[in-house]
């Protein structure tokens, strides 16, 4: 019986680890591709019908007139990932915070409101124009009647809602500018910023401009640079357009909007009404021709001289 040396055992163990690692990688990639194929949507499907299979109670509250759209994403703290969904509305809906900005959770008690002896208290406006978005990313689970513990923190995120439309527009532009800057900074430090030109002098100038812009942002903050400067650097240094990337990302794993979908029952009612109107108009025109006709059978006509 031949005796194996310790070196042979170590080589076999190393080879086994390599095979096991490769097999585990293959399984993980296959599982991820499977989960990715489950949400492989791009403006497809009716939102209410999709939510009906996820959460039937919530599907009853969806209104097609609100322009509902459902998005899916993969997430979680462990592997395999979980599928999360979120409902978006792309039309104006009635919001109590927009009409009544007061924080009704901190109203004074009834006994204090009728107390005329004490001087009136100064009303605290600290909680006004602030809302808590309860529409966060929720995991897709077949236990829709039970509360899920793996709720993401974004559902309780507090955001400020300014009364001025101009201020809200400025805040939105600032958020978009911050996203572009973070995009450029991350690609710069990862070495993914590649210039479109091949001229050596132009490459040096682009590299210096990018480095100077990054340094200005780190020293003076986001407000130290303009948005058009960031756009210029991104246009010169990268072949991937940021706006196109964001637009494509928003359409990935997304259902169709209910604003572009028509109910089958409503279509049948509209067709029946149009058919009835057409039949009534046809019948009315035929009756008009019948009664407006000239009949001379029993009429005496005087001969011409």
Curated annotation (Swiss-Prot):
Keywords: Cytoplasm, Membrane, Mitochondrion, Mitochondrion outer membrane. GO terms for biological process: negative regulation of mitochondrial fission; negative regulation of protein targeting to mitochondrion. It is found in: Cytoplasm, Cytosol; Mitochondrion outer membrane. The keyword Membrane applies. One of its GO terms (cellular component) is mitochondrial outer membrane. The keyword Cytoplasm applies. Can homodimerize. Interacts with MFF; the interaction inhibits MFF interaction with DNM1L. Acts as an inhibitor of mitochondrial fission. Interacts with MFF and prevents DNM1L recruitment to mitochondria, promoting a more fused mitochondrial network. This is Protein MFI. The gene is Mfi.
